């Protein structure tokens, strides 16, 4: 049974709290956590079959998926990262060392010179987040970019973050899209 909405935390307050907790992790600890998450991901039976990954370029204290995508690219997996165009995410081919642009708020994205990758062709989305609920609810930054994307595609939605980003449930809205799994230094959790 879901708790009454009166007992659920406010999304804005929860975003602030989870960002502060994530920011409190030292760069060395974040790096160690990412390396441990990579070990867990390598054990996932679907990992070796992934052909195209939709990833992201990390911002500030976000989980840095570069180690995950590097190991995938070494075995021939294509990596794409999003550019924001007209309030929508459009994925572009990306390799370490490619040119990037800095957007509003310091967020990095591939340049428009890189090849477009259709979102429908992506079979695994490594998804940034502030929080992940116990049932796969994703707490993002409030822009709805990933909710709009996930309403249109069928690829596996894997939230990537740190264990401290697992949160108590909050009130979700009709447009909120759930994750299929969550990866952290503690392991891989799949949601039904």
Q: What are these model-predicted stretches?
A:
Residues 58-61, 130-134:
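Short glycine-rich anion-binding loops that position phosphate/pyrophosphate groups of nucleotides
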Residues 70, 139-145:
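Charged helix-capping and loop-helix junction motifs
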Residues 1-9, 13-16, 20-27, 111, ...:
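Surface-exposed, charge/polar-rich loops and edge strands
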Residues 88, 122-129, 142:
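A short beta-strand-loop-alpha-helix capping motif that often carries His-Thr
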Residues 2-120:
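N-terminal active-site beta-alpha-beta segment that forms phosphate/nucleotide-binding
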């Amino acid at each position: 049974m879901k708790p009454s909405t009166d007992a659920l935390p406010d999304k804005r307050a929860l975003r602030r709290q989870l960002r502060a907790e994530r920011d409190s992790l030292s760069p060395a600890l974040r790096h160690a956590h990412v390396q441990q998450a990579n070990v867990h991901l390598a054990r996932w039976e679907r990992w070796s079959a992934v052909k195209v990954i939709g990833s992201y370029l990390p911002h500030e204290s976000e989980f840095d998926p570069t180690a995950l995508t590097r190991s995938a690219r070494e075995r021939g997996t294509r990596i794409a990262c999003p550019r924001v165009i007209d309030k929508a995410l459009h994925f572009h081919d990306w390799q370490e060392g490619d040119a990037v642009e800095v957007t509003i708020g310091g967020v990095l994205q591939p340049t428009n010179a890189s090849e477009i990758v259709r979102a429908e062709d992506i079979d695994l989305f490594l998804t940034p987040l502030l929080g992940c609920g116990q049932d796969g609810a994703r707490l993002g930054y409030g822009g709805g970019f990933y909710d709009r994307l996930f309403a249109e595609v069928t690829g596996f939605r894997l939230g990537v973050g740190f264990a401290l980003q697992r949160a108590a449930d909050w009130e979700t809205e009709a447009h909120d899209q759930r994750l299929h799994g969550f990866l952290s230094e503690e392991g891989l959790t799949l949601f039904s």
